[in-house]
């Protein structure tokens, strides 16, 4: 692993400022993909900006006809949340099958969406449910967000804050 500086963000604005100040930096939340990439020297960063304690990235909230899920919500939290289970049962089921218990306990919705691994389940779910990715700078419909394998419309200094799903009239 190459040397890097670790920065724990105290807020979303500070995290964005640090990403702009250090162009070779990367945000870190669950770290399920980034940390192994760093360990195996497949990626190199100047700074890691830790987002794991940011309250702005947490929470699951019904907002009218949509459900907003914070980017920092762990897979196991999405899977076990009563609101997700009742409004988007397939998404709850999907989240409960991601990886293994350790991955579900650490990995986050935002990290999986930002990484856009073709083997991941969340990107397909966002596309199928016409979700909107909410960043600290704008809102992007899923169809415009995912550009290709491991590629998204995110700018280097842009952070996913939440994902908004329209609640379907019917769900199975």
Regions found by a protein language model. Name each.
Residues 1-172:
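C-terminal structural segment of proteins
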């Amino acid at each position: 692993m190459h040397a890097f500086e670790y920065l724990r963000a105290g807020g979303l604005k500070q995290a964005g400022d640090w990403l702009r100040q250090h162009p070779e930096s990367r945000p870190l939340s669950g770290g399920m993909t980034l940390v192994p990439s760093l360990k195996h020297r497949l990626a190199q960063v100047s700074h890691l900006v830790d987002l794991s304690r940011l309250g702005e990235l947490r929470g699951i909230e019904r907002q009218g006809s949509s459900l907003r899920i914070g980017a920092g919500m762990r897979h196991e939290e999405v899977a076990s949340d009563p609101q997700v289970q009742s409004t988007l049962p397939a998404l709850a089921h999907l989240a409960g099958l991601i990886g293994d218990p350790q991955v579900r306990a650490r990995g986050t919705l935002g990290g999986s969406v930002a990484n856009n691994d073709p083997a991941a389940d969340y990107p397909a779910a966002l596309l199928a449910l016409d979700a909107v990715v909410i960043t600290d700078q704008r809102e992007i419909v899923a169809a415009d967000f995912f550009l290709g394998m491991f590629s998204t419309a995110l700018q280097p200094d842009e952070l996913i804050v939440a994902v908004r799903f329209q609640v379907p009239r019917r769900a199975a």
